[in-house]
């Protein structure tokens, strides 16, 4: 059994253990949880994972340490189809034309669900700073969620509604990434955000918060800024990064979906062989005990 339930994996794997499931894998995908009224219960569940799982996997070092503490774990990088996101100039021009973005406008992009930890409202302050200094710029949000209305209201309060595009959930994310000039993620915390990896695969400069793990930064054009830095500083870095031309296509081999599939298949086969050997040894021990 391979559980991707974060803190709740311990509960599910505990039931699997009681029913004799021999291989029980817990997979960590986050580096934190909101400190709401449910957090003490989640923290309790998290602590039982090393006792109910036979194997521990994580999307990154930070996620593994947060979820499993000092218990040993294996990092299995998150997988993306890198070819799907390879930069296409024609696709960029077509999408910018469709979105109504001129050549002179700077387009900042973000892909993600509208949740508290995603902190999208911070990007509105960044856009406000950019426009206040005379930069023709717009902000593009791809995704939906419970906090979307609040972010839209904040945009209206700042007088930014004409300059912010809320596209909702889309199937053409690669084309939308190509249309962007800079990708931003100001999250309070993350595990290994797929959107940041996809943006890097598309060749975009990426600016992320210190809530995003450093091992997510895989190209020279990806960098971190603390959330304690003012929006004006983020605006300054975004403007500087948007003017730097990419010298070569990015290489994200360790995150390539084919490589990831090979790694996971090899891991499953290894565990199956290990289980068969343990079962065989157990049978032999019982035979010798009966003699």
Regions found by a protein language model. Give the residues of each.
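Short hydrophobic beta-strand element within catalytic cores of glycosyltransferases
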Residues: 196, 205-209, 214
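Nucleotide-activated donor-binding/catalytic signature segment of Leloir-type glycosyltransferases, i.e.
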Residues: 152-168
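Donor nucleotide-sugar binding/catalytic pocket of nucleotide-sugar-dependent glycosyltransferases
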Residues: 51-91, 224
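Short His-centered aromatic/hydrophobic patch
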Residues: 3-9, 28
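Aromatic "clamp/platform" in nucleotide-sugar-dependent glycosyltransferases that forms part
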Residues: 169, 188
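A charged, aromatic-enriched C-terminal amphipathic alpha-helix characteristic of glycosyltransferases
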Residues: 84, 243-288
């Amino acid at each position: 059994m391979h559980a991707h339930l974060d803190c709740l994996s311990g509960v599910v794997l505990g039931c699997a253990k009681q029913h004799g499931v021999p291989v029980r894998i817990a997979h960590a995908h986050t580096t934190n949880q909101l400190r709401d009224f449910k957090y003490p219960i989640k923290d309790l569940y998290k602590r039982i994972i090393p006792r109910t799982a036979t194997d521990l996997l994580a999307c990154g070092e930070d996620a593994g340490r947060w979820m499993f503490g000092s218990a040993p774990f294996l990092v299995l990088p998150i997988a993306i189809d890198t070819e799907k996101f390879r930069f296409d100039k024609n696709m960029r021009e077509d999408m910018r034309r469709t979105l109504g973005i001129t050549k002179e406008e700077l387009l900042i992009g973000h892909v993600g669900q509208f949740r508290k930890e995603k902190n999208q409202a911070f990007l509105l302050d960044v856009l406000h700073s950019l426009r206040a200094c005379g930069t023709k710029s717009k902000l593009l949000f791809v995704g939906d969620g419970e906090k979307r209305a609040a972010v839209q209201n904040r945009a209206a309060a700042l007088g930014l509604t004409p300059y912010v595009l809320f596209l909702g959930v889309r199937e053409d994310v690669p084309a939308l990434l190509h249309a962007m000039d800079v990708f931003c993620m100001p999250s309070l915390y993350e595990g290994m955000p797929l959107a940041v990896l996809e943006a890097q695969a598309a060749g975009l400069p990426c600016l992320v918060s210190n809530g995003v793990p450093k091992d997510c930064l895989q190209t020279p054009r990806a960098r971190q800024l603390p959330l304690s830095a003012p929006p004006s500083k983020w605006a300054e870095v975004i403007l500087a990064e948007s003017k730097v031309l990419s010298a070569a296509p990015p290489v994200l081999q360790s995150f390539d979906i084919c490589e990831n599939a090979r790694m996971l298949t090899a891991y499953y086969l290894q565990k199956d062989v290990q289980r068969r050997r343990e079962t065989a040894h157990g049978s032999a021990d019982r035979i010798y005990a009966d003699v």
